[in-house]
């Protein structure tokens, strides 16, 4: 008996909506990454993108534990001499809360083309409104 291998065109994709109000950042991000990879499906294969679409609303109401608001820093470089930039988590949550969740999930996905395709299925919004009502997203309860 041969092992069944699913083809990318056979994958059924659903849309999920997650409310981030009061949820812990890391726990929420790991659940979202699991859905984006497709690990919740019985036919999961690591080399096939079989994940679903995830919409995150109320990103500005995310919660973090400990002293991370002041101590956690995000770094990037402009590729110019002396171009190392840094921002604290507190600044990021005030100005770009969508980016905080997107980066947390991105760092939990594979670092290759497949991971890039998975990240494109993540939609993060600051408030409770999103433009994806036509896809009929189902609410996903995350215990985070």
Swiss-Prot record:
Listed InterPro entries: Ribosomal_uL13 (IPR005822), Ribosomal_uL13_bac-type (IPR005823), Ribosomal_uL13_CS (IPR023563), Ribosomal_uL13_sf (IPR036899)
CDD domains found in the cross-reference section: Ribosomal_L13
Presence of the UniProt keyword Phosphoprotein in the record: no
Region (Disordered): 125-144
GO biological process: negative regulation of translation; translation
GO CC terms in record: cytosolic large ribosomal subunit; ribosome
Entry GO MF terms: mRNA binding; structural constituent of ribosome
Top-level lineage group: Bacteria
Oligomer and partners: Part of the 50S ribosomal subunit.
Entry similarity comment: Belongs to the universal ribosomal protein uL13 family.
PANTHER family: LARGE RIBOSOMAL SUBUNIT PROTEIN UL13M (PTHR11545:SF2), RIBOSOMAL PROTEIN L13 (PTHR11545)
Full protein name: Large ribosomal subunit protein uL13
């Amino acid at each position: 008996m041969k092992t069944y291998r699913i083809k990318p065109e056979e994958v059924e994709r659903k849309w999920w909506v997650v409310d981030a109000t009061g949820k812990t950042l890391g726990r929420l991000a790991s659940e979202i990454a699991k859905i984006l990879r497709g690990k919740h499906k019985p036919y999961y294969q690591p080399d096939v993108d079989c994940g679903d679409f995830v919409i995150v609303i109320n990103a500005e109401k995310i919660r973090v534990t400990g002293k991370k608001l002041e101590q956690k820093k995000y770094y990037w470089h402009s590729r110019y001499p002396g171009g190392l930039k840094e921002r604290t988590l507190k600044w990021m949550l005030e100005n770009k809360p969508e980016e905080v969740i997107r980066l947390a999930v991105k760092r939990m996905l594979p670092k290759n083309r497949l991971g890039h395709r998975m990240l494109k299925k993540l939609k993060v919004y600051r408030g409770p409104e999103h433009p994806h009502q036509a896809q009929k997203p189902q609410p996903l309860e995350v215990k985070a």
